[in-house]
From Swiss-Prot:
Record-listed ATP binding positions: S14, L15, G16, K17, G18, I19, D71
Activity control summary: Allosterically activated by GTP, when glutamine is the substrate; GTP has no effect on the reaction when ammonia is the substrate. The allosteric effector GTP functions by stabilizing the protein conformation that binds the tetrahedral intermediate(s) formed during glutamine hydrolysis. Inhibited by the product CTP, via allosteric rather than competitive inhibition.
EC number: 6.3.4.2
Name of the gene encoding the protein in the UniProt record: pyrG
Ligand binding (Mg(2+)): D71, E139
Extra information: CTPSs have evolved a hybrid strategy for distinguishing between UTP and CTP. The overlapping regions of the product feedback inhibitory and substrate sites recognize a common feature in both compounds, the triphosphate moiety. To differentiate isosteric substrate and product pyrimidine rings, an additional pocket far from the expected kinase/ligase catalytic site, specifically recognizes the cytosine and ribose portions of the product inhibitor.
Naturally occurring in which organism (per UniProt): Thioalkalivibrio sulfidiphilus (strain HL-EbGR7)
Family designation: Belongs to the CTP synthase family.
Ranges of residues in domain Glutamine amidotransferase type-1: 290-541
Protein's UniProt name: CTP synthase
Length: 547
């Protein structure tokens, strides 16, 4: 029987429920338990696929093609699981399912209400996502007290009652601020947050108290007294300089022991040697490189969360400290490429819309002409093709039909037909809805032997995740390859170009897929490791010249 750990948050948002949940799951996995994680989002959008990155941050794409919350990226990086559409659902999805059932007549003419129909659908979705796990950690998005979260909180309250204390446990993450002017830690916000939670019928079993320093014993006792939580279950969740230290910290606070004792589970001791190795590799690098990330969402780096982490993972696996310099592609359009001069490598990530595209193309040109290692992902591959078409193949005005529908040379165009994971034909047009209509999820790509991509992966076939509507236009295949563009990866049926390279360049690669979604701190990713090794070689070459 699956046991459940429900994680809620209080006082303020962005306290790190996702990382806390993933870290606890990592410890439980290290104790030999089969775990899974779910994220419940209170917003009415069906999924975050059409939400602005400035509002929501990154959209994480799962293997089965779901567009989900970025916390699922944390789950996959901390725990050796592949999440899917059952691991993340929203208020919009829940209401959509209930309304669909009502239209079918499933409720036999009854009045459809939040309780029991919405809460029952939430409980059904939680149980479906948790199926087969020893322990399911269920994170409730938002903050206790938000009106949007109430149906979710009511649903997990009911589950706690239905399953009993030995099968369900509640963890509440809260803020314990330090007031510098008074020189004191304040526990009142935590007390009020727990009071709010208890007012809707949930008594937390464990408190994770987010603070910039460990809780003094006096404050711990005070919190325990006023929240009705046993003192040893009031855990200090201190700020750390490296999120991959958090499993080690929470284990040192005996969080996993408290959880397993309350759930009546016997498990072997945790083997956290992998996490110790990760932390050690980050703290003692052999070299340092600077990678310029040229994008349009650089004011909110959470927009590139998986990409940031993938570069860190590559640093772990190559003994390199990777410093990311975020560069606004719009500024490159007006200020020129001077800001690129002292970089060891350039990366152009994915994105949508015309804003900043010419700046990205300028960054590609600089990398190509100056022999700087370049990695282009999704749109980053497309702008590499556009730049090559314009300045090497001589196709003046070459562009993507996403930005210039009437371009004389549409080297990038809308995909109108492709095969999905099950081999079914998917068709789209320019008039299709924006939500959920892209080429999404894991797709098999065949690599050409003797190419850089094949060298990095060491395999003829790979599976990577996609999220795009536009693709390389095969009508320009002969022209561009004749000019020197290398096509090193194609879709399984050979119809779509997935990877491009330049043969007379130290390291230049563009991929239509998103390799960052499958990178983890313990395993890394071959493409990013190859990119960072190339950045190190570039750094050493630059240092030699300056000496």
């Amino acid at each position: 029987m699956t046991r459940y750990v429900f994680i809620t948050g209080g006082v303020v948002s962005s306290l790190g429920k996702g990382i806390a949940s993933a870290s606890l799951a990592a410890i439980l996995e290290a104790r030999g338990l089969k775990v899974t994680l779910l994220k419940l989002d209170p917003y009415i959008n069906v999924d975050p696929g059409t939400m602005s990155p400035f509002q929501h941050g990154e959209v994480f794409v799962t293997e089965d093609g779901a567009e989900t919350d970025l916390d699922l990226g944390h789950y996959e990086r901390f725990v050796r699981i592949k999440t899917g559409r059952r691991n993340n659902f929203t208020t919009g999805q829940i209401y959509e399912n209930v309304i669909r059932k009502e239209r079918r007549g499933d409720y036999l003419g009854g009045t459809v209400q939040v309780i029991p129909h919405i809460t029952d659908e939430i409980k059904r979705s939680i149980r479906a996502g948790a199926e087969g796990a020893d322990i399911a950690l269920v994170e409730i998005g938002g903050t206790v007290g938000d009106i949007e979260s109430l149906p979710f909180l009511e649903a997990i309250r009911q589950m706690g009652v239905e399953m009993g204390h030995e099968n369900a446990l509640f963890i509440h993450l809260t803020l314990v601020p330090y007031i510098a002017a008074a020189g004191e830690i304040k526990t009142k916000p935590t007390q009020h947050s727990v009071k709010e939670l208890r007012s809707i019928g949930i008594q937390p079993d464990v408190l994770l108290c987010r603070a910039n320093q460990p809780l003094p014993e006096g404050e711990r006792r005070k919190i325990a007294l006023f929240t009705n939580v046993e003192e040893r279950a009031v855990i200090s969740a201190v700020d750390v300089d490296n999120i991959y230290k958090i499993p080690l910290w929470l284990h040192s606070q005996k969080l996993d022991e408290i959880v397993l004792r309350k759930l009546h589970i016997d498990a072997p001791p945790a083997d956290l040697s992998d996490w110790k190795h990760v932390v050690n590799a980050m703290e003692f690098p052999e070299a340092e490189v600077t990678v310029g990330m040229v994008g349009k969402y650089v004011d909110l780096t959470e927009s590139y969360k998986s990409l940031n982490e993938a570069l860190t993972h590559a640093g772990i696996h190559t003994g390199t400290k990777v410093t990311i310099r975020y560069l606004d592609s719009e500024k490159l359009e007006t200020e020129g490429a001077g800001c690129l001069e002292d970089l060891d490598a350039i990366l152009v990530p994915g994105g949508f819309g015309e804003r900043g595209v010419e700046g990205k193309i300028a960054a590609v040109r600089y990398a190509r002409e100056n022999g700087i290692p370049y990695l282009g992902i999704c749109l980053g591959m497309q702008v590499a093709v556009i730049e090559f078409a314009r300045h090497v193949a001589g196709l003046e005005g070459a562009h993507s039909t996403e930005f210039r529908p009437n371009t004389p040379h549409p080297v990038i165009a809308l995909i109108t037909e492709w095969k999905d994971r099950e081999g079914r034909i998917e068709q789209r047009s320019a008039d299709s809805d924006l939500g959920g209509t892209m080429r999404l999820g894991g797709q098999v790509c065949q690599l050409t032997p003797g190419t850089l991509a094949h060298q990095c992966y060491g395999s003829d076939h790979i599976t990577e995740r996609h999220r795009h509507r536009y693709e390389f236009n095969n009508g320009y295949l002969e022209t561009l390859t004749a000019a020197g563009l290398v096509i090193s990866g194609r879709s399984e049926d050979g119809s779509l170009v997935e990877v491009v390279e330049l043969k007379d360049h130290p390291w230049f690669l563009g991929c239509q897929f998103h390799p960052e979604f499958t990178s983890t701190p313990r395993d890394g990713h071959p493409l990013f490791s190859g990119f960072i090794r190339a950045a190190r070689a570039q750094h050493e070459k630059t240092q030699t010249k300056s000496d």
